[in-house]
Amino acid sequence: MELKRVVVTGLGAITPVGNSVPEFWENLVNGVSGAGPITHFDASLFKTRFACEVKDFDATKYIDRKEARKMDRYTQLAVAVAKEAVADSGLDIEKEDLNRIGVIFGAGIGGIRTFEEEVGNYAINKENGPKFNPFFIPKMISDIAAGQISIMYGFHGPNYATCSACATSTNAIADAFNLIRLGKANAIVSGGSEAAIAAPGVGGFNAMHALSTRNESPETASRPFSASRDGFVMGEGGGCLVLEELEHAKARGAKIYAEVAGVGMSADAYHLTASHPEGLGAKLVMLNALEDAEMDPKEVDYINVHGTSTPVGDISEAKAIKEVFGDHAFELNISSTKSMTGHLLGAAGAVESIASILAIKNGIVPPTINHEEGDNDENIDYNLNFTFNKAQKREVNVALSNTFGFGGHNACVIFKKYAE
């Protein structure tokens, strides 16, 4: 069976540095940080009192007010980015076979804000007997965003959620890619969203010592590959890609951002939360993606790394890149856009895939901000080009995006410039 080619025809993003794809990209290229004091709850007694929040998000711009009240913030973000991506794709819902359009959209955590609110209310009032919102469960569960998007458009194709912590939305893109190239759908709306900047989310990650505590300077806290890094910065938001079978896209005259070349998945099988110190899972996932794409490592121009600004993770990923790419590792560009957006958890892969695609489209590699001269880690080879502090113009024909999640879940997707 000949596999079909898959292209990207629509993009949607709401992030801490922009509430649309154009705004997101402009701020990435300009090295703008989305970090600031937490406003979603009173974090004054927390070790970490800052995060990368989405600013000025009004769900009612995208959803009827009554329907919005039935959704957790993570689902509201999902619906909003799906609307941008579907509109951007130019899909004519009236003319399409909706049985051949699917939705694969995930969250690493899901409705934690709803869970906190409902369980908190119960704890306060339990002597009066249980009283829960009838929408508690559907607001909380991590699959509901995919369901809401399909209901909104009437898409009857493959529909489910992925959940693999921070690899979630890359897995969603990978599944969409595989289903389309096998002929199971004409198009799939794929991606992820997350809204876990809440007391349980921040408190839980603080308890693990996973978050930066650079409270005096939030905008400089996310500093991947710098010696003074002290943990990741929580972010929130959503990213959505419309993946489409090439001939279907061409037949309707769709614009094509890029082609999906290949995907890879692997497991560290090492630790619940820490990546393998030698980067074994990271190495394997990149090799798997390159094999799937039938691509030589020397063809890759840009890697959007997982690069969370954690002490162990950044070292292991840098090691893996050197092992996979050899001498070419010093020729390609590497950057972590998490230095600006923070870590969007389940939404990270989709948002970073969009950054990778726009690097191809625009010939610009966004920077890794916040690196200071002399702030070098002896365990990291700075002959690698981490694109520190300033975007770089270069031709990008092939971009690779890594995402690694708690539990040892690793996912990688490769995009390439579309050509007939």
Stretch-by-stretch model annotation:
Residues 8, 23, 29-164, 193-202, ...:
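Conserved beta-ketoacyl condensing-enzyme motif
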